[in-house]
Amino acid sequence: MFLYNLTLQRATGISFAIHGNFSGTKQQEIVVSRGKILELLRPDPNTGKVHTLLTVEVFGVIRSLMAFRLTGGTKDYIVVGSDSGRIVILEYQPSKNMFEKIHQETFGKSGCRRIVPGQFLAVDPKGRAVMISAIEKQKLVYILNRDAAARLTISSPLEAHKANTLVYHVVGVDVGFENPMFACLEMDYEEADNDPTGEAAANTQQTLTFYELDLGLNHVVRKYSEPLEEHGNFLITVPGGSDGPSGVLICSENYITYKNFGDQPDIRCPIPRRRNDLDDPERGMIFVCSATHKTKSMFFFLAQTEQGDIFKITLETDEDMVTEIRLKYFDTVPVAAAMCVLKTGFLFVASEFGNHYLYQIAHLGDDDEEPEFSSAMPLEEGDTFFFQPRPLKNLVLVDELDSLSPILFCQIADLANEDTPQLYVACGRGPRSSLRVLRHGLEVSEMAVSELPGNPNAVWTVRRHIEDEFDAYIIVSFVNATLVLSIGETVEEVTDSGFLGTTPTLSCSLLGDDALVQVYPDGIRHIRADKRVNEWKTPGKKTIVKCAVNQRQVVIALTGGELVYFEMDPSGQLNEYTERKEMSADVVCMSLANVPPGEQRSRFLAVGLVDNTVRIISLDPSDCLQPLSMQALPAQPESLCIVEMGGTEKQDELGERGSIGFLYLNIGLQNGVLLRTVLDPVTGDLSDTRTRYLGSRPVKLFRVRMQGQEAVLAMSSRSWLSYSYQSRFHLTPLSYETLEFASGFASEQCPEGIVAISTNTLRILALEKLGAVFNQVAFPLQYTPRKFVIHPESNNLIIIETDHNAYTEATKAQRKQQMAEEMVEAAGEDERELAAEMAAAFLNENLPESIFGAPKAGNGQWASVIRVMNPIQGNTLDLVQLEQNEAAFSVAVCRFSNTGEDWYVLVGVAKDLILSPRSVAGGFVYTYKLVNNGEKLEFLHKTPVEEVPAAIAPFQGRVLIGVGKLLRVYDLGKKKLLRKCENKHIANYISGIQTIGHRVIVSDVQESFIWVRYKRNENQLIIFADDTYPRWVTTASLLDYDTVAGADKFGNICVVRLPPNTNDEVDEDPTGNKALWDRGLLNGASQKAEVIMNYHVGETVLSLQKTTLIPGGSESLVYTTLSGGIGILVPFTSHEDHDFFQHVEMHLRSEHPPLCGRDHLSFRSYYFPVKNVIDGDLCEQFNSMEPNKQKNVSEELDRTPPEVSKKLEDIRTRYAF
């Protein structure tokens, strides 16, 4: 078995975010890392929408990311620390839309090791040097400079190693143009290591160490080191030189401290806490991330606590000495992994979990009522300040980037009866969790919908003048009339436009600079800017059946297949070409391309005929109306559309930006198939046809504009958009009802919209999330969802949600009540009334936990609910709250053979589980009966067990439960579940159970799979085979009777199969005659499974399912990852295909090595050598390579570049999208 890996949705969780001017213009951009992906985002300063410019897989782990700019430069570069053992400097090239690797310096081994640098990066604020550090011992400094041609140069590394030292954080200190300086949080463990009593370990202090790079001596000196009172977790650089006092802020538990060289005394300020917080008051508070904003006249920091509260931090200075730190509560946003304050006044928040946000900073919070806390305020040691959290005041949310991270569980099923299956994804963490329903398609936002007096048959938009940015009219054609609407603040009917209203319209367009043309069955109407009208009438009894129009040309087809061609002359007059062309059959459809910039006309006309052919006809004056080429079609054409797509932006001599693309002829057939063919711009030849089935109706095509480029809207029983995005073609369905006719639409509110008709309504639509594979509907949940099952009859979901370090609703209410009573008791006689009012206000206050976070209850505190949800509407049908410290870990829905048709839900619950050091007071299996057509849970009984029941699976009318490391069969009893049989030989802890026939495949938490056979006659569970590798299995899926696919904690997927000669009729040998080694107890079972495939995904996979994703497609193995990625593994059906893709992968490894310097083969073999899997993500980078490299690779394969692209596209569309 050979598999091909494809990513459907890239990871969405963000681990690092940096901002700068990476394209060299004044625009602010953000570069984010998503594990093994680098992405460049650009927030639009006018609309606030975030656009993705570029996404690159780096096939390595990005451990750190920094932006820097050389002194006096205008462009920011990106430094990447990864697991490749190399430092890489990247530059963004806007003309090619790619990251270019400028430098790659090797300094150590690959992999995330503790003494190989790459974990921390720090840059001198003036861009003169960069320090790259490991977690332990090694630090290297590189000097950055320019050569004579103004190219960036990098020195050889200077060492600043210190053995036996752990590093917690590194930053560059702003010292102006003095010698560059770096500050590190370090801890020396040498004494602690050598002291057997443990005293030294208890007394070890963290130190703040400054390293200076002496540019004169080309040497790094350890300048200064001092011990810290509290344990710091990160550092913030304070602007220096002419901008500020320099130095660093140390964020530590409960305190923020300012430190600098020389006479500067330490200034420290406690971190304010929330008033009346339900958290444990003994728990420390830390800052988790920060952002700095600096202008010529001032600077401030925004720092976020682990509850999500942002504080604005300012420093008061007296000359060059800092005298106080001031903190002011700013706003509360979800806890972030990184924050960026952009110069355009935006705050980008990359959330740790869940969606990411872009906020506009509306106020700086200087002049409001909020109290300001200062280091100068007197406080007792151990006391702190208190503040009151509130909804957003200084920030305004302008955009939200959907993120599925973390996906904890996923099932694929067509519960909504839509033919195409939906993905039901349990994602998020704590109160920000959600169940999301993903459907393949682009999200459509409805701008306006209005009823029309009848059912129209077509719609167009036209501009009044070629220079206009927005459309002026919408023209709607009915069976016997034409309606003209003007576009302004509102859309209203106009009568003086010059259009003929008493006839249907076949087409209309802007002609020349400022004239309009209307083609109707009896003729052509040319309306000049001064409302003069020229008419051309059809000869005799003939009428116009089809037409094609662009800015300068009109072609019409009369009944009987006669073509008449008109072209506009320089005076703006429409002139008929002297000859007419008789076609051999009736014309069904026609298309002209837009006139290319700087040319007189479009050279080609495409005509589709009844005889199942498309013909390309020249419109060049030298051979006008001569046929150039022809393509036979599998069915009759319905519509044609010539577009220029896939262009790269180029600047001409005058600095005008234009794009040079390829001409594509799109052909929509009557059988619902879309063909895309390349049209040669010189000869008119047609080549390289791609085919996709779109739906059951004939396909109509319309040209629209998306992100400044031409795109094609194709309408069948579903509407599809074909567009080029990040140098790849996408053909994606719209998640919207069926449309009948459409046209591009541009107005002030909606610069790139679509106007469309559906039955008797006119709709204005916008597509904002181009490039998105899925559109999603999210239903909020209360705690982190762990698993869910689908009730087969009602299609409802039964979800278990469990959170550690959390209170149940009942405990929360009880704690609040208790705190309110304490408030009243603590008040003196005269303050009783006020205290009672405050207590009442506190009890009524309800800040949403999805924004303000849930209170942290402490270790060993658990909260759980069991929820029954309707997956289509998303409403909760039933909710069972478990008691405090009961944690639900497993759920199953099953029938028992002795109870007939009733369905039961079993939930495995742990009691008082402490994770480290692990201890548990036991567990329960709750049994519920599903009543009310699967909408309500009726409690039957609970069965006590000794350990955590972490896996439950229905099995032959009974149920299998993994209790710790015991595998048991239970049956339903009146008072509890009855134990029928057990096996004690599983190694550690059962994390999953799959069943097929009499076989049971058990996943162990760290010992891979164990095959068990149930013998009904002897009522025994007998182990007959296992795996030879230790795998920390997270999820598994059966592929057939002998084969199982599994994923582990470290990001690998494997497929394991039992050899054909495996015998599962083994006995436990009650006689004892068998030799000891035959039993195989020393090294597991006597029979071993074979590994068929191994592959390192690079993200922890938490669900696997064998399913089909598109109607009529083949089966594939779909996986989802903790980082929010969704991918598939698909089997090759022929040896030729496998051989071809193996060669593509081999050539790309050498021709197009990964961006951050990691070797592709060793990345995919991180833990086990990659076996029988070809990496489709690498193969698909073929399309983004430079044309000459594409040519070299395809020549090696004896193909042309379009043929290779077509193979890549075909394998993707056969299984997915």
UniProtKB/Swiss-Prot annotation:
UniProt region (Interaction with SF3B1 and SF3B5), positions on chain: 193-231, 786-804
Gene3D superfamilies referenced in this protein's UniProt entry, alphabetically: 1.10.150.910, YVTN repeat-like/Quinoprotein amine dehydrogenase
Region (Interaction with SF3B1) residue spans: 1028-1049
Residues with Phosphoserine modification: 156
Record site: Interaction with SF3B5: 284, 306, 352, 429
Region (Interaction with SF3B5) location: 1100-1123
Location(s) in or outside the cell: Nucleus
GO cellular component terms given for this protein: catalytic step 2 spliceosome; nucleolus; nucleoplasm; nucleus; SAGA complex; U12-type spliceosomal complex; U2-type precatalytic spliceosome; U2-type spliceosomal complex
GO MF entries: nucleic acid binding; protein-containing complex binding
Coiled-coil features, chain-numbered ranges: none
Keyword Nucleus listed: yes
One Pfam family this sequence matches: Beta-prop_RSE1_1st
Domain of life: Eukaryota
UniProt keyword annotation of Ribonucleoprotein present: no
Region (Interaction with PHF5A, SF3B1 and SF3B5), start-end ranges: 105-119, 145-168
Keywords, alphabetical: mRNA processing, mRNA splicing, Nucleus, Phosphoprotein, Spliceosome
Quaternary state and interactors: Component of the 17S U2 SnRNP complex, a ribonucleoprotein complex that contains small nuclear RNA (snRNA) U2 and a number of specific proteins. Part of the SF3B subcomplex of the 17S U2 SnRNP complex. SF3B associates with the splicing subcomplex SF3A and a 12S RNA unit to form the U2 small nuclear ribonucleoproteins complex (U2 snRNP). Within the SF3B subcomplex, interacts directly with SF3B1 (via HEAT domain), SF3B5 and PHF5A. Identified in the spliceosome A complex; remains associated with the spliceosome throughout the splicing process. Component of the spliceosome B complex.
Function: Component of the 17S U2 SnRNP complex of the spliceosome, a large ribonucleoprotein complex that removes introns from transcribed pre-mRNAs. The 17S U2 SnRNP complex (1) directly participates in early spliceosome assembly and (2) mediates recognition of the intron branch site during pre-mRNA splicing by promoting the selection of the pre-mRNA branch-site adenosine, the nucleophile for the first step of splicing.
Domain comment quoted from the record: The core of the protein consists of three beta-propeller domains.
The name this protein goes by in its record: Splicing factor 3B subunit 3
Organism: Mus musculus
Lineage: Eukaryota, Metazoa, Chordata, Craniata, Vertebrata
